[in-house]
């Protein structure tokens, strides 16, 4: 039990087996020739004759963006171009709250980002990453139009950092960074790494709910200090809710953020053993531009353990939706995400699982990812998925990733089952399958 609702606890364990049993006919219906063909294509691309790339080729890919390196220089000391391209296809097959079956297909330029990073003056680093794509070809005309737009949309990162420890040589700490600009507010485990490094096709909707996203689903402006002492790393920051396509200002809400990372790997029997605590509190009114959809506060506990070919990442978090335009979207929420992973072929083929359970105190206190359930709802007026909103959500994910050149060139494939309810009534249940080609340097 995670939260109480109307003085009644919602039991998770009894729900899971019955949900899976009831979903089997829908799953069998889902396995059409078309979806099987998607999987066959994905596996064909991973055949050794096609997929094998030698270490020299992969090393060239990883270093492709490096174009300047002069560590002894007094001005610019190094610089690197960044590019990330991801193309994604998906298929959904499910039932709405009235039991009406539907299915839909999607194809998109998932991400196309370019950027520049480097260091100068011995103590300074800079980073800027521009989102250059806005692919809405899957959206209906009545929801803002169906189009593919190219050019600068927003910055995913744009910041300047100062190596304070190297400059002042603090005796009691190992490192200290001071920074200003646009950056990520890390909460759930899935947001501890870049989109180029995530293990699933999409981050879970619960991790996205905790994320400090701005009104254009980007990373906000912040000022921060981060330092490391022994096994402990601390991060304190103030984030601004004010949005701008470029840098922005400080005229709207403010979010106060703090986190602690404890790395116990050296003293543990596991190769990987980490704990992460993070918290934020937002101050702002309903009329302000706000982060994280207006969340008032959130607290997250992350544990990561791993040994040899396996790893288990866990996120447990709670929060409050803050003031919303509709009362049934306010109130407390909480959830848990378990992500086991196993290397079937070392550094080549990884099996990824994920279980998600989340619930909220109000009937529409949760919302699923736009890919692809709410999107399917907007495309088909004959079904009603309540725009992907509800108060209780289960999701089971199973993925298989093939790494041509480590994280720099890979194929990510995943199958997910979702069950969404609101006030005890079913809103959606069904399966989503997808595949994504991802390359970056």
Model features per residue range: what roles?
Residues 2, 36-38, 43-50, 223, ...:
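Intrinsic disorder/low-complexity segments
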Residues 17, 46, 50, 134, ...:
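Hydrophobic alpha-helical membrane context
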Residues 53-58, 88-104, 127, 143-151, ...:
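Outer-membrane beta-barrel pore domains
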Residues 1-58:
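Cleavable N-terminal export/targeting peptides
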Residues 5, 206, 435-437:
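In a subset of proteins, long, contiguous C-terminal domains/tails are tracked
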Residues 42-44, 179, 335, 414:
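Small side chains
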Residues 54-69:
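Short N-terminal segments immediately surrounding and downstream of signal-peptide cleavage
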Residues 68-93, 101-244, 250-269, 336-363:
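Outer membrane beta-barrel
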């Amino acid at each position: 039990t995670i939260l109480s609702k109307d003085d009644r606890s919602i039991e998770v364990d009894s729900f899971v087996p019955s949900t899976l049993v009831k979903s089997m006919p829908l799953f069998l219906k889902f396995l059409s020739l078309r979806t099987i063909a998607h999987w066959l294509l994905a596996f064909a691309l991973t055949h050794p004759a096609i997929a094998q790339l030698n270490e020299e080729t992969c090393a060239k890919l990883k270093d492709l963006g490096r174009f300047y390196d002069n560590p002894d220089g007094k001005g610019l000391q190094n610089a690197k171009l960044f590019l990330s391209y991801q193309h994604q296809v998906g298929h959904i097959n499910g039932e709405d709250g009235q039991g009406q079956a539907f299915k839909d297909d999607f194809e998109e330029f998932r991400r196309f980002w370019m950027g520049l990073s480097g260091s100068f003056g011995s103590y300074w680093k800079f980073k800027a990453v521009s989102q250059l794509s806005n692919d809405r070809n899957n959206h209906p005309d009545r929801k803002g139009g169906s189009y593919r737009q190219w050019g600068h949309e927003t910055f995913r990162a744009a910041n300047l950092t100062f190596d304070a420890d190297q400059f002042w040589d603090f005796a009691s700490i190992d490192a200290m960074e001071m920074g200003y600009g646009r950056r990520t507010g890390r909460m759930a485990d899935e947001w501890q790494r870049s989109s180029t490094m995530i293990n699933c096709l999409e981050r879970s909707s619960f991790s996205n709910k905790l994320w400090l996203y701005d009104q254009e689903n980007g990373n906000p402006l912040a000022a921060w200090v981060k330092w490391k002492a022994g096994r402990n790393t601390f991060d304190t920051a103030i984030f601004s809710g004010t949005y701008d396509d470029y840098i922005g200002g400080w005229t709207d809400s403010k979010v106060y953020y703090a986190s602690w990372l404890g790395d116990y790997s050296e003293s543990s029997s596991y190769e990987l053993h980490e704990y992460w605590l993070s918290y934020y509190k937002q101050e702002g009114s309903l009329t302000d531009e706000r982060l994280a959809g207006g969340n008032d506060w959130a607290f997250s506990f992350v544990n990561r353990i791993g040994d040899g070919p396996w790893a288990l990442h866990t996120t447990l978090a709670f929060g409050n939706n803050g003031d919303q335009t509709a009362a049934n979207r306010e109130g407390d929420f909480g959830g848990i995400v378990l992500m086991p992973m196993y290397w079937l072929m070392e550094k080549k083929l990884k099996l990824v699982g994920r279980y998600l359970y989340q619930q909220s105190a109000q009937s529409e206190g949760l919302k699923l990812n736009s890919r692809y359930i709410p999107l399917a709802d907007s495309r088909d007026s004959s079904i009603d998925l309540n725009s992907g909103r509800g108060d209780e959500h289960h999701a089971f994910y199973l993925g298989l990733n093939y790494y041509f050149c480590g994280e720099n060139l890979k194929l990510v494939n995943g199958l997910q089952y979702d069950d969404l309810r609101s006030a005890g009534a079913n809103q959606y249940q069904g399966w989503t399958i997808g595949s994504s080609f991802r390359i970056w340097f």
